[in-house]
């Protein structure tokens, strides 16, 4: 009986380890000119997710939630932002249309697995949007 119980505990531990979520974001940093449409990528290892969220973090500040995609959804849109979710391939993409210097921040994706109450975060993508200085606003002195 003890052997059976030991095997059951070992099996449960292996199941927990094998189902541990890993979230990866590539590239780690991205620099684009103002006005460019851009794509940020996120991949996750366990497709049994409850939802996936995209956040932004400005230097020295906390996280700001941008979009949340439930596992039953394929995409979410808010203004110039659009996030897609493909559970079968373990990928999510955040599209930012007509980038602006104010979009410069670190963008993070996080997956919440079914049955768990914790988010697993990627390491983030640091985005720098360079202003268009070819047509600067006139300065009045």
Residue ranges and their predicted role:
Residues 47-78:
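N-terminal V-set
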Residues 28-31, 79-102:
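Extracellular beta-strand/loop-rich beta-sandwich domains predominantly from IgSF
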Residues 126-130:
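Short beta-strand edge segments in extracellular beta-sheet folds
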Residues 37-46, 51-58, 95-98, 103-113:
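Structural signature of extracellular immunoglobulin-like
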Residues 131-141:
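Extracellular/luminal ectodomains of metazoan preproproteins built from arrays
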Residues 1-27, 108-116, 121, 134:
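N-terminal Sec-dependent signal peptide, specifically the hydrophobic helical h-region
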Residues 33-35:
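Solvent-exposed, conformationally flexible loop/turn segments
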Residues 24-29, 139-141:
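Surface-exposed, proline-enriched loop/turn segments that connect beta strands in immunoglobulin-like
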């Amino acid at each position: 009986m003890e052997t059976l119980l030991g095997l059951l505990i070992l099996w449960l531990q292996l199941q927990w380890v094998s189902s541990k979520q890993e979230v990866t974001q590539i590239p780690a940093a991205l620099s684009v000119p103002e006005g460019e449409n851009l794509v940020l990528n996120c991949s996750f290892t366990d497709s049994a997710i409850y939802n996936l969220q995209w956040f932004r973090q400005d230097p020295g500040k906390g996280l700001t939630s941008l979009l949340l995609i439930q596992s039953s959804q394929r995409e979410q849109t808010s203004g110039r932002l659009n996030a897609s979710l493909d559970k079968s391939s373990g990928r999510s993409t955040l599209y930012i249309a007509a980038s602006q210097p104010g979009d410069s921040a670190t963008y993070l994706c996080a997956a919440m697995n079914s049955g768990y109450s914790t988010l697993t975060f990627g390491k983030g993508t640091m985005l720098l949007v360079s202003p268009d200085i070819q047509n600067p606003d006139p300065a009045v002195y």
